[in-house]
A protein has these predicted regions:
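Conserved active-site and cofactor/substrate-binding residues in soluble primary-metabolism enzymes
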Residues: 17, 34, 43-47, 121-125, ...
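Aromatic-enriched alpha-helical interface/lid elements that frame and gate functional surfaces
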Residues: 104-179, 183
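Short linear loop/turn motifs
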Residues: 141-152, 157, 187-194, 255-265
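A glycine-rich dinucleotide-binding beta-alpha-beta segment and adjacent secondary-structure elements
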Residues: 178-230
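Active-site-adjacent "lid/gating" segments in soluble enzymes
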Residues: 1-115, 120
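Flexible, small-/acidic-enriched active-site or ligand-binding loops
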Residues: 211-258
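Helix N-cap/coil-helix junction residues
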Residues: 136, 198, 251-252, 264
Length: 265
């Protein structure tokens, strides 16, 4: 934040995760490791964008501008709304796998060492669909209610792990789909471009940089009237747009010549 006891301290992604409680929910055991993308950086940026948009809407209505501020700490706390609400209701900090148990989410490794993500949520039909897909009707009697599946999550997870380890992923996928189980095979980032849904939605595109050739990037995730195309210029080289920015700031051609001769730009 702009003030307070931490205001003068440097902050990066992992600092934001540690300060906001996120880091405690993503590691366990005696050998904790940092994993995943820079969540704090992305979340703070998203909330900043929302704040700017809100200020622009207000300005259009009132003619008054706003100073928009976002701290990484507050942004990450806001994004943790679900576990935070649970903690406030129960007085207990969520365990590492608390959300997985409540949402009935599982990651299972198949015989070929490829993984599947399952999320059964609340509807009973998804649990029954999973039981039918893996041909284990005995589990209906062993775990008759959702409350029992939540309470005995570790035991159920171990059973599912044993079942899925018996066949390759290609065996399980059509069975899960046929029984309408919420699942997806675990994708690596380098596999995304080959995913049929990703291809259908036209997620990735290529642009040509004048010096560095073809570059691949992802379109924006928002569609306007069905269109998600991004009209972005290629990433600039160091200093490529400095003169353009300075001209927009009001510097004259003569001012730019002086700066260029002095080696400033």
């Amino acid at each position: 934040g702009a003030s307070g006891p931490y205001a003068s301290r440097p902050a990066y992604d992992n600092v934001g995760q540690a300060a906001s409680g996120w880091l405690s929910m993503f590691h366990a055991g005696a050998d904790p490791k940092v994993a995943g993308p820079a969540v704090s950086d992305a979340v703070a940026g998203l909330y900043a964008a929302l704040g700017v948009l809100g200020a622009l809407v207000e300005r259009a209505q009132t003619g008054r501008g706003r100073k928009v501020e976002v701290s990484m700490l507050e942004a990450m706390i806001a994004m943790a709304c679900e576990p935070l609400a649970a903690m406030m209701a129960t007085g207990q900090a969520p365990s590492l796998y608390g959300r997985a148990a409540m949402s009935q989410s599982y990651v299972v490794t198949c015989r070929d060492q490829r993984r599947i993500g399952l999320h059964l949520s609340s509807p009973e039909k998804f649990w029954r669909g999973l039981v039918a897909a893996i041909e284990r009707p005995d589990l209906l009697a062993a775990y008759p209610t959702r409350a029992e599946r939540v309470e005995r999550y570790p035991a159920l997870a171990a059973t599912l792990a044993e079942v899925f380890a018996g066949q390759d992923r290609d065996y399980w996928e059509p069975r899960l789909e046929r029984h309408d189980v919420p699942f997806m095979p675990e994708r690596r980032l380098d596999e995304l471009a080959d995913d049929p849904q990703v291809q259908h939605q036209g997620v990735f595109y290529e642009q040509v940089h004048p010096r560095h050739g073809a570059l691949r990037a992802a379109h924006r995730p928002v569609r306007y009237d069905g269109d998600n195309r991004s009209d972005f210029r290629p990433p600039p080289d160091l200093g490529e747009h400095t003169a353009e920015v300075l001209r927009e700031a009001g510097l004259s051609a003569q001012d730019l010549d002086i700066l260029q001769q002095a080696g400033v730009v």
